[in-house]
């Protein structure tokens, strides 16, 4: 195919832009978004389910960016790690896992200790507190001392939920008769993913440098921070009790989502680590709940699921070029997660990374790097060499997580303006744009009591098809509607149909494009008397 003849299909992911009709706390409705409003009124559109069983999560579990992008790229419902791990604990199979049996035996013989590091949260996005409870039960049954290094959430949960969660954890430890919460650290420090190494360093040092601790309960310490208006996400690394990670110990990082667990893991295990000066702990067994990065020298409890015939793979095997573009905060999502947990690009897949602004929180700069992402995408689209472009706008989600309503409105308005520019560029080359979101967030900024809601939601997400003049979808006659009842798993098959590529049997989602004959039938006059 001549490069000049390519009319691209562009998938635009509005991260965290959910759909909700109630106006209270709804930044999406409060924002001036003439582009999206016009598209919704003019072009084929529908709502998609992006949470719970529709994306491989437990019923009622809110969606998230990792799961959303994985489902979009896989074109099928993929059982998520949250479910896999919970099932292993519930059935007891986790306790017979050969890796854990061997580590328990060695620690028992050599007098080593367990350290459980992870996000102590019921959010279910990066971890789940029930998984920690399962690991603590394992340690107690084996008679091995256990130290919990609790990372506090406040981003996928309410900002001050941590005290309640940690109080419940302390009761669980009392019931088990073993284990102690040794350290606290807000995810702002322990789960940075933007190479702000000074944050990671503070978390690492509290984990590896011992001290007497403050001798107070975790819940009491959390309440003191709340009194200073420091919420869960921003809890400074704090030692509660002696129990630093030492030589001969074993660490289990129980986060199942990789992106925000990598930097801290690298500090523990990489011999050539250069993020900051650190003391490397020798003879340390380091286990991650899932595979964070295939290059990390760690042991993995739950190996990756082998997904075949993903959207990017099908496009690549058809000999077509594709582009993935996002700013730092969502770059892993349009690459690693969209490709089913594969870091390596497919042949013909190019990637553009735009640096996210270096600010403490994104409400300080709601525009983030959306303009730069748009500029680079427009340049790439104008070259007419990419059959598929996958682009993410991070603003609605990342600013929505701050709980700042006015800033989130600005973020949405920024994305709307950028989307208008992007669409004009796609139209210029006769391309087609499919606009979706991966989960809800910005449409719910406070709860029924008026408290800030910084987590995701279970709300459906919009999906809009903007068909290019020079691209007529095969078999659709250029007159297309989008069916209702769809999920994120249906987006991949939809894109393949627009591209004119066959859908592999592994993709069990169904195209959202309604059959042309159904559309025609719908326009027939109703019989008299009905």
Curated annotation (Swiss-Prot):
UniProt-recorded Gene Ontology molecular function terms: manganese ion binding; phosphoglycerate mutase activity
Cofactor, how bound (note): Binds 2 manganese ions per subunit.
Chain positions recorded as Mn(2+) 2 binding sites: 15, 65, 438-439
Enzyme class: isomerase
Active site per UniProt: 65
Pfam families, per database record: iPGM_N, Metalloenzyme
Cofactor: Mn(2+)
Residues where substrate binds: 126, 155-156, 187, 193, 257-260, 330
Pathway: Carbohydrate degradation; glycolysis; pyruvate from D-glyceraldehyde 3-phosphate: step 3/5
Keywords attached to this entry: Glycolysis, Isomerase, Manganese, Metal-binding
Reaction it catalyzes: (2R)-2-phosphoglycerate = (2R)-3-phosphoglycerate
E.C. number: 5.4.2.12
UniProt GO cellular component terms: cytosol
UniProt cross-references to InterPro entries, sorted A to Z: Alkaline_phosphatase_core_sf, BPG-indep_PGM_N, Metalloenzyme, PGAM_B_sf, Pgm_bpd_ind
Single GO BP term: glucose catabolic process
SUPFAM superfamilies referenced in this protein's UniProt entry, alphabetically: 2,3-Bisphosphoglycerate-independent phosphoglycerate mutase, substrate-binding domain (SSF64158), Alkaline phosphatase-like (SSF53649)
Binding site for Mn(2+) 1: 397, 401, 456
Role description: Catalyzes the interconversion of 2-phosphoglycerate and 3-phosphoglycerate.
Subunit relationships: Monomer.
Family in the record: Belongs to the BPG-independent phosphoglycerate mutase family.
PANTHER family for this protein: 2,3-BISPHOSPHOGLYCERATE-INDEPENDENT PHOSPHOGLYCERATE MUTASE
Matching HAMAP family: GpmI
Protein name: 2,3-bisphosphoglycerate-independent phosphoglycerate mutase
Upper lineage: Bacteria, Bacillati, Cyanobacteriota, Cyanophyceae, Synechococcales
Gene: gpmI
């Amino acid at each position: 195919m001549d490069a000049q003849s390519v009319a691209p299909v562009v998938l635009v992911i509005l991260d965290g832009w959910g759909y909700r009709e109630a106006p209270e706390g709804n930044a999406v409705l409060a924002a001036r978004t003439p582009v999206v409003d016009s598209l919704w009124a003019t072009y084929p559109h529908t709502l998609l389910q992006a949470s719970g069983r529709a994306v491989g999560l437990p019923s009622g579990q809110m969606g998230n960016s990792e799961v959303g992008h994985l489902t979009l790229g896989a074109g099928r419902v993929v059982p998520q790690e949250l479910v896999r791990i919970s099932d292993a604990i519930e059935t007891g199979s986790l306790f017979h896992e050969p890796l854990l049996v061997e580590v328990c035996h060695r620690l028992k013989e050599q007098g080593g200790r367990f350290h459980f590091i992870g996000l102590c949260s019921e959010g279910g996005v990066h971890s789940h507190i029930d998984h920690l409870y399962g690991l603590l039960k394992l340690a107690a049954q084996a008679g091995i001392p256990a130290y919990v290094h609790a990372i506090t959430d406040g981003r996928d949960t309410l900002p001050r939920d941590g005290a309640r969660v940690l109080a419940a954890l302390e009761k669980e430890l009392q019931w088990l008769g073993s284990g102690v919460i040794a350290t606290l650290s807000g995810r702002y420090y322990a789960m940075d993913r933007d190479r702000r190494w000074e944050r990671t360093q503070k978390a690492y040092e509290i984990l590896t440098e011992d001290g007497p601790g403050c001798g107070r309960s975790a819940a009491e310490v959390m309440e003191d921070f709340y009194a200073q208006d420091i919420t869960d996400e921003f809890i400074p690394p704090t030692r509660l009790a002696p129990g630093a990670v030492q030589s001969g110990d074993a660490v289990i990082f129980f986060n199942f989502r990789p992106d925000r667990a990598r930097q801290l893991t690298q500090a523990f295990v990489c011999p050539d680590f250069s993020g900051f000066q650190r003391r490397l702990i020798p003879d340390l067994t380091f286990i991650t709940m899932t595979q964070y990065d295939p290059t990390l020298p760690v042991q993995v409890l739950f190996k990756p699921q082998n997904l075949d015939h993903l959207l990017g793979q099908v496009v690549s095997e058809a000999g077509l070029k594709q582009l993935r573009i996002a700013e730092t905060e969502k770059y892993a999502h349009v690459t690693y997660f969209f490709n089913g947990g594969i870091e390596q690009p497919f042949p013909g897949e190019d990637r553009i990374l735009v640096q996210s602004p270096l600010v403490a929180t994104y409400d300080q700069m709601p525009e983030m790097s959306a303009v730069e992402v748009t500029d680079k995408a427009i340049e790439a689209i104008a070259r007419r060499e990419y059959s598929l472009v996958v682009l993410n706008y991070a603003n609605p989600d990342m600013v929505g997580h701050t709980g700042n309503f006015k800033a989130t409105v600005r973020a949405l308005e920024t994305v709307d303006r950028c989307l208008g520019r992007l669409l004009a560029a796609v139209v210029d080359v006769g391309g087609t744009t499919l606009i979706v979101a991966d989960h809800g967030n910005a449409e719910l900024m406070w709860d029924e009591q008026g408290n800030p809601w910084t987590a995701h939601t279970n709300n459906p997400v919009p999906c809009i098809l903007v068909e290019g003049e020079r691209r007529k979808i095969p078999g659709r006659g250029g007159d297309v509607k989008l069916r209702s009842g769809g999920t994120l798993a249906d987006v991949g098959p939809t894109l393949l149909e627009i591209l004119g590529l066959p859908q592999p049997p592994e993709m069990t989602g169904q195209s959202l494009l309604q059959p042309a004959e159904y559309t025609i039938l719908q326009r027939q006059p109703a019989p008299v008397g009905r």
